Amino acid sequence: MTSYEKMIHILHNKDFELLEDWVADDYFFVFESQMWTRDEFLERMKDFFSRSEKASDFMFEEKCLYENEDCMNYTRLERQEDGEMYRVVGMVLKNSDGKIWRSIERITKVEVKNDTN
């Protein structure tokens, strides 16, 4: 299973155990201007899994842009809690054990066009 396939499996199956095993001890996650340690990230993901709907209900057009043994770059559309649609772009760096070591994501609001003609 590639790292991208593993990430998709974790998100779509709410596989917290696999996520916890995959995250390196010295991991941190940067989202826009916020940063979380491994423990903070895992706590947020546990909360997210417990209260979220199926990933396929709010994640669309998921795509791996690039992957090798050191990194993975991906994008997707995601409907946020505010109901707006955003383009998520992320980068994951892996350590020599293949665990995720650093992650960064940014989001950009996407204008959804409604054709009512």
Q: Where are the predicted features?
A:
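Amphipathic alpha-helical repeat scaffolds
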Residues: 5-9
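A beta-strand edge to alpha-helix "cap/lid" segment located at domain peripheries
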Residues: 12, 30, 43-117
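Short, well-ordered alpha-helical segments enriched in acidic and aromatic residues
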Residues: 14-30
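A diffuse structural propensity rather than consistent per-protein peaks
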Residues: 15, 37-38
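Short, well-structured alpha-helical segments
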Residues: 20, 38, 42-46
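A short gly/proline-enriched turn/hairpin at secondary-structure junctions
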Residues: 26-37, 50
